[in-house]
Design a protein with these regions (language model features):
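Conserved NTP phosphate-binding and transfer environment spanning the P-loop NTPase/kinase superfamily
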Residues: 97-182
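Solvent-exposed alpha-helical segments within well-ordered globular domains of core cellular machineries
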Residues: 11, 35-36, 143, 147
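Short, acidic/polar N-cap/turn motifs at the starts of alpha helices
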Residues: 9-12, 49, 118
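Short acidic-glycine loop/turn motifs at beta-strand connectors
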Residues: 16, 53-58, 103, 124-126
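P-loop NTPase nucleotide-binding/switch module
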Residues: 1-17
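A short, structural micro-pattern
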Residues: 7, 92-94, 125
Length: 182
């Protein structure tokens, strides 16, 4: 099967066996988020440039060989992760299952607060779920990414927090009105 290839500026991390493509403008904190996730036991596939290959209906990412296993942290420099954390914190390629786009938080910027419908982003003809996360000083973007992955996995099992609250509200309204909500 022919591979369709492209590349993007970002980082690819495996979180709970789920490939997370971190996107956002230069300097937003993608590499710092990746470092936080690595320190929590997750695995780096690529930092800075992510090569993307389509294999059937799946996407697989990797780093260009020259920068494979490196993480660039402003103020520290280039970190070669196998030397610092051991070979278990890196992988030469991994799946891309979820896109987390980091955007600067500021007054007036709106973020999804219900999560009923997941936005999508296309890469190499494959539609991926997209979560837009606020990156702000002293914020824990890594925690938001982990929560996004857990939510993604829960959605794959057929349930969302929005559906739970909707069911609870419908039940409450039915109880108060004496009949089911239509």
């Amino acid at each position: 099967m022919e591979e369709i290839k492209t590349q993007t500026h970002g980082a690819l991390i495996e979180v709970l066996d789920t490939g997370v493509l971190l996107l956002g403008r230069s300097g937003i904190g993608k590499s710092e988020c990746a470092l936080d996730l690595i320190q929590r036991g997750h695995v780096l596939v690529a930092d800075d440039r992510v090569k993307i290959a389509r294999r059937g209906d799946r996407l697989v990412g990797s780093a260009p060989e020259m920068i494979r296993y490196f993480l660039e942290i402003r103020g520290i420099g280039l970190l070669y992760l196998p030397d610092l954390y051991g070979p278990e914190v890196v992988r030469s390629e991994g799946p891309i299952d979820l896109v987390c786009r980091l955007v600067e938080w500021s007054e007036g910027v709106t973020f999804d607060r219900i999560g009923a419908q997941r936005a999508r982003e296309m890469f190499a003809g494959v539609s991926l779920p997209l979560v837009t996360l606020p990156a702000r000083p002293a914020g824990s973007v890594a925690t938001l990414v982990e929560a996004s992955v857990r939510d993604h996995l829960q959605r794959a099992r057929g349930a969302t927090g929005a559906e739970r609250i909707d069911a609870a509200l419908r039940a409450l309204q039915a109880e108060r009105s004496g009949g089911p909500l239509r």
